[in-house]
């Protein structure tokens, strides 16, 4: 019996100081789908290890591989970087040191605003919105990246 290669996907990340939202593409890399939220640890290194373990478990469960990771870079409206953008860059560097998967930073300006607006329109309670806003933001970041590839 022939071993079929595992389908590959692209992973989207919305990094936050307390939570990280994850989204993934479909096999054709056209549509972004929300996945899960990972809570951060006190130290960045611990968060990266926890995230890689989570990604590994997801890949095992879904029998897929991640070919690329897209991390939202929160630029200011002027295009300049601020404190959180510097934290994202540091996080991306730590992640790249521990995985051979290529990592790309992607402009995420206003994605959280867009996610919150979409969730308000969906009639979810504030409590439910707060639980999913990070994965919806990750999906928006990833979808923007996927759309740019067409």
UniProtKB/Swiss-Prot annotation:
One of its GO terms (cellular component) is cytosol. Pfam families: RuvX (PF03652). InterPro entries: RNaseH-like_sf, YqgF, YqgF/RNaseH-like_dom, YqgF/RNaseH-like_dom_sf. One of its GO terms (molecular function) is nuclease activity. Gene3D superfamilies: YqgF/RNase H-like domain. CDD domains: YqgF (cd16964). Its EC number is 3.1.-.-. It is found in: Cytoplasm. Disulfide bonds: none annotated. Belongs to the YqgF nuclease family. Could be a nuclease involved in processing of the 5'-end of pre-16S rRNA. PANTHER family: POLYNUCLEOTIDYL TRANSFERASE, RIBONUCLEASE H-LIKE SUPERFAMILY PROTEIN (PTHR33317:SF4). This is Putative pre-16S rRNA nuclease. It comes from Protochlamydia amoebophila (strain UWE25).
